[in-house]
Amino acid sequence: MSILAINKSKIATNVWFDDNKMYVSLEDGRELSIPIDWFPSLRDATEKQRNNWRFIGNGEGIHWEDLDEDILVENLL
């Protein structure tokens, strides 16, 4: 018997927020919805601070300079 393993992308293409969640779009079309309560620095940040992010590692992670916060996409899966 053979086992088929599907390699899913762990590369982010976009990040946005509402009042309670962070959303992350992935290269393969998936969208993640993550409670910002999981990340106290994001939860307590201003809208301006939350929106001041950039990708690191070609989309493998997200960095917030103002908050000194890094999140790896694979840790959200």
PLM regions with names:
Residues 1-77:
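Motif-centric detector for short Cys/His coordination patterns
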